[in-house]
Amino acid sequence: MTPALSPSRASDFMQCPLLYRFRVIDRLPEPPSAAAARGTLVHAALERVFDLPAPERTPEATVALLPGEWARLVEEEPELASLLTGPVAGATSPGEAIVAETDADRERAWLEEAAGFVRTWFTLEDPRRLEPAERELYVEAEVDGLVLRGYVDRLDVAPDGRLRVVDYKTGRSPSEQWEGKALFQMKFYALVLWRTRGVVPTLLQLVYLRDGEV
């Protein structure tokens, strides 16, 4: 079997080879991450909104997609439901947690937090004026005996054939010290697209939804 590598796993290896071993070779189980789940939820809504006719791609319509997308994610990965259950921070007893906050309250707060990222996106881009060529595009290419693969959040193609690769980030925009990790991921995608399409992307665009920066 030809070895395969995604940008996130390549980043793991560069950051810490032992972390790479735990995740890829030993496959040690990891509990669900609230940050990762929130990112997946927001990404899903920003992907699905383009199924709507352009005039209907509003902030309200996109936020309305969140409950259904969250239900779908939980159905696919039931362990995600554990992120919205259990004692609240600061509660002195399980009973107090139940009084202080129910699971329904947690879900409403969770969805509202995700909605904040969606609303920020609309201050940066207008989906009514966009028609992506691809969304959540799986890309794969073999380079020097190694399969490089991953998912591109959005691929825009201009009438003259120029490519723009867009990646949504729900974390904070990194300092210069850590910016290289995000740029590495984009260069990874650019290499794979060049190998598969014969075109080097003209623009690699990171969209930071927490800070509202591009």
Question: Predicted regions: what is each one?
Answer:
Residues 13-14, 40, 150:
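Short conserved micro-motifs on helix faces and helix-strand junctions that flank
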Residues 16, 42-43, 114, 154, ...:
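A residue-level signal for conserved active-site and pocket-lining positions in enzyme catalytic cores
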Residues 137-214:
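Mg2+/Mn2+-dependent nuclease catalytic core
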Residues 26-35, 51-57, 175-178:
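Short, polar/flexible loop-turn hinges at active-site or ligand-entry regions and domain interfaces
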Residues 1-36:
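C-terminal, charged and often intrinsically disordered regions of DNA end-processing helicases
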Residues 34, 38, 42, 110, ...:
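Hydrophobic (often cysteine-bearing) scaffold residues that line and stabilize catalytic clefts
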